[in-house]
Amino acid sequence: MNDVVLSCKNVSKKYTEFKTDIAILKDVNLEIKKGEKVAILGLSGSGKTTLLNVLGGLDKCSAGEVYLMGERFDNQSVNKRAKMRNKHLGFIYQLHHLLPEFTAIENVMIPLAITKKYTKKESIKLANEILKKVGLDHRADHKPAELSGGERQRVAIARALVTNPNCILADEPTGNLDSQRSESIFALMQQLSDDFGISFVIVTHDEKLASRMNKIYRLVDGELELVINSN
């Protein structure tokens, strides 16, 4: 059985500026298996976020191929990519991007509304269950302004998890948190990955936290290098 959730083959990405091609990604190959926890390290501007966006179907590669759950992903129509993305992927960002006028539970329910598969009652039940998993069911009716930075990021994690994705792509998920809260968020993501068999691809500048992952890659001048493989 093929347990590869997300992969890219010979992916390159370039932009043209003032008639000059600027290479952001160069012939990148990456394979993410079920339940695997992968960290991608790199300096600011190294292309980490671009790679995450290409893997998540939010940006198109200039060359190469991206596969999601064994199906070619990068060459699909915008609508088909969106459907595949909503079904199989979750996203966590450095800034939580919670809607300020919505409560924690309402923010978590948003991806369920997009799928149009659940009644409101079912959505509330699912959102409550996942908030409990991240230890925030007692804060379900609080708006983001009433939550701490760590709590807001936990809500963002719950929102990413609520549709039961196969893989979560996280871009500097602890970048705005202090070291203690960063440790707590990383431990939570590891536990959720172990409990649900969800793959995590985490872009981070924090080498200490990255060391907890199964694999560590480093992106240097657009080229991806495997640093550690503890599988």
Swiss-Prot record:
Keywords: ATP-binding, Cell inner membrane, Cell membrane, Membrane, Nucleotide-binding, Translocase, Transport. ATP binds at G42, L43, S44, G45, S46, G47, K48, T49. Its EC number is 7.6.2.-. The keyword Transferase does not apply. The complex is composed of two ATP-binding proteins (LolD) and two transmembrane proteins (LolC and LolE). This is Lipoprotein-releasing system ATP-binding protein LolD. Residues 6-230 form the ABC transporter domain. Part of the ABC transporter complex LolCDE involved in the translocation of mature outer membrane-directed lipoproteins, from the inner membrane to the periplasmic chaperone, LolA. Responsible for the formation of the LolA-lipoprotein complex in an ATP-dependent manner. InterPro entries: AAA+_ATPase (IPR003593), ABC_transporter-like_ATP-bd (IPR003439), ABC_transporter-like_CS (IPR017871), ABC_transpr_LolD-like (IPR015854), LolD_lipo_ATP-bd (IPR011924), MacB-like_ATP-bd (IPR017911), P-loop_NTPase (IPR027417). It comes from the Bacteria. Belongs to the ABC transporter superfamily. Lipoprotein translocase (TC 3.A.1.125) family. One of its GO terms (biological process) is protein localization to outer membrane. Pfam families: ABC_tran (PF00005). It is found in: Cell inner membrane. One of its GO terms (molecular function) is transmembrane transporter activity. It comes from Francisella tularensis subsp. holarctica (strain OSU18).
